[in-house]
Amino acid sequence: MTSNEKEMGKSELLVVTGMSGAGKSLVIQSLEDMGFFCVDNLPPVLLPKFVELMAQGNPSLQKVAIAIDLRGKELFKSLVKEIDIIKSRNDVILDVMFLEAKTEKIISRYKESRRAHPLNEQGQRSLIDAINEEREHLSEIRSIANYVIDTTKLKPKELKQRISKFYLDENFETFTINVTSFGFKHGIQMDADLVFDVRFLPNPYYVEELRPFTGLDEPVYNYVMKWKETQIFFDKLTDLLKFMIPGYKKEGKSQLVIAIGCTGGQHRSVALAKRLAEYLNEIFEYNVYVHHRDAHIESGER
């Protein structure tokens, strides 16, 4: 939502959807704490009627978040159509947030909660089959989402913090860049738009006194950044991003996720993600956030 649209008093509608077990309930709870009027599991066919209520100017409906999932089954099929209808209006700003997680993580969460998956309420099939079917059903709505968040590696507190950064930031409407470091041995960053592999750089893991630390610590950071290869890579990377990022924004993208990966996600990727976020903050007026997904893992890089 832009500053001009805020001045015009347009209402905000956020549709929260995605995989069952990916964290929709937690996101809705967080948004409610931030002053959103929240509705859980509204049938998609009722979305236009709800927007009509919002358009009447009720102050309590100025910022609304609606969670929609496959519990509606057949009704869910109309969601993309209803969203297109709402986007054609000029009095309500609509965003779509899609939450997902790796299949094995969703299985783990369901085992912990002991709840039935919405596509397997009778227990007549395997959980993995239900998850795969749901992922297929959701592919279309995922493709039109403004924000895609992979919660596989996020603790509940970290997910809440990410939502808070989005919606408590006065400049959120401009453009958001998320820079993430990760370790390939722990899995690729699933929600990344751009992935850069820095495993070709000298590895601090093999310097015994540096091994226990991360790229956020000065000795490791200095070690990673001192090499000629690092400087050449960083210069080429920033030249590329200076060219690409304005194009993403021009095409209407509101969030860009840049992931930098090394082997374990503790040293090289952390140092470069830190430096890249600082650089992007210096040259752009966009919101730039940095997250180190695997830096806390004590085993380090291999």
Swiss-Prot record:
Binding site for ATP: 18-25
UniProt protein name: Nucleotide-binding protein SE_0548
SUPFAM superfamilies per the UniProt record, alphabetical: P-loop containing nucleoside triphosphate hydrolases (SSF52540)
Top-rank taxon, per record: Bacteria
InterPro entries xrefs: P-loop_NTPase, RapZ-like, RapZ-like_N, RapZ_C
UniProt KW keywords: ATP-binding, GTP-binding, Nucleotide-binding
HAMAP family: RapZ_like (MF_00636)
Protein family (similarity comment): Belongs to the RapZ-like family.
One GO MF term attached to the UniProt entry: ATP binding
Described function: Displays ATPase and GTPase activities.
Binding site for GTP: 69-72
Entries under Pfam families matching the protein: PapZ_C (PF22740), RapZ-like_N (PF03668)
Protein species of origin: Staphylococcus epidermidis (strain ATCC 12228 / FDA PCI 1200)
